[in-house]
Amino acid sequence: MNHDVIRTASLCAAAVCTLVFTWSAGAQQSGAPAAKRTLVRAGHVLDVKTGKLADAQTIVVVGDTIQSIAPTASVTAQAGDAVIDLGGMTVMPGLIDVHTHLTMNPDFDPYRELTSTSAKEAINGVVNAKATLMAGFTSVRNVGASGFVDVDLRDAVNAGQVPGPHMLVSGPLLGITGGHCDENLLPIQYHLVGDGVADGISEVQHQVRQNIKYGADLIKICATGGVLSKGDDPQASQYTLEEMQAIVADAHRLGRKVAAHAHGAQGILWASKAGVDSIEHGSYINDEAIAEMKKNGTYLVPTLYLEDWQIEKGSLPPFYHQKMVDVSAVAKSNIKHAVQAGVKIALGTDAAVYPHGLNAHELDVYVNQIGMTPLAALQTATVNAADLMGWSAKTGTLESGKWADLIAVEQNPMEDVRVLQDVKFVMKAGVIYKEVTK
């Protein structure tokens, strides 16, 4: 993600309120609280653990929770129940994207982005959170935002002020001076520094604690250089092993997981050795890094569709474009090797490098370019992603006691994952956000 354009800012409450009234009016129709019970009648229910379909099922929802799933013939509607008949559609758990930037958009004039305000980023977040939810993604990790804008966005979603997915958020990214997570566009006299720049053991410990103080659910660091940043090399390590060990130790002690942006093999290796919970991107991963990740149970979060979209449709400045071309030339083959070797994969998209709401296109890449089975691909966006987020008890599968997060599509995604690019029905925590149109 373009961390040159992440600036110190705070969420402007008025910016969120700009769109609250529009949302509130719609909520009276499709986002109203569920009745005492909601019966969701499905033609088929997909078990994402096994890939098996159960035909003619009814999901009984009470409040924000799944109460039961049973054959429709055995479930009788009671007075006061709301009944949602999805006909022959296939119902499955809401999807999860563990690498988003909801407060940003794919506008790649980095100098124009320097003029963006906290109010603009807040409005972006409100619009993009809704687009993501309506695309069938009911949970996300937001891994990078200026000034804790994502913290307040998360809180607004949780309070029901705006529609959006369940969120875990990182706030500002931690990185070295002059690195991918710093601000490198202006000369020294402008004193432009990234929110989370920290060098050395004591500084990184302070930054971890500060991010947590202001509401971060996880810590995001830059272990290597990046693509959408000026003056650095994606293959070059940035944080040292010792700095990352200090970050992970403090974060884990305080109950937070750590995600590491890492393209280069050395940075991937060190980050996994340090104990991070996920590697984001992993473009130049090699056998040594793969072995370390498997030993430690580190998740890999590929972000591959963005390369196709950017090269075909994007308008990157020259100092970004060549790096994107170089990375895309090797990333898919390296990620395919990691998948074949058994590295754990969770779906992440880097949404904001391409338009929000297209998140499900990542699954098509996994199946048709990386060689995953449809079931393995679906698991990256459900059970695996839930596990990485620490939410396996809450979401990732359709089971009694879990959040009533479910989506419906017209065909079986086990036969063609591309059907998930056109989700017809979305329920999150028992609230219907997208209804089937006749």
Question: What kind of region is each of these model predictions?
Answer:
Residues 124-150, 164-172, 216-229, 257, ...:
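Divalent metal-dependent hydrolysis catalytic cores, especially in the metallo-beta-lactamase
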Residues 31-36, 45, 50-92:
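Histidine-rich, glycine-flanked metal-binding segment
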Residues 86-161, 177-180, 184-187, 242, ...:
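Metal-associated gating/positioning segment near the N- to mid-region
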Residues 10-22:
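Bacterial N-terminal signal peptides
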Residues 103-121, 177-193, 227-241, 296-328:
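Active-site gating loops and adjacent loop-to-helix segments of metal-dependent hydrolytic enzymes
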Residues 253, 318, 327-413:
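His/Asp/Glu-enriched, well-ordered alpha-helical/loop segment
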Residues 155, 159-173, 235-260, 301-302:
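Alpha-helix-loop-beta-strand connector modules within alpha/beta enzyme cores
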Residues 107-110, 150, 229-231, 268-274, ...:
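Histidine/acidic-residue-rich catalytic or RNA/ligand-binding cores of hydrolases
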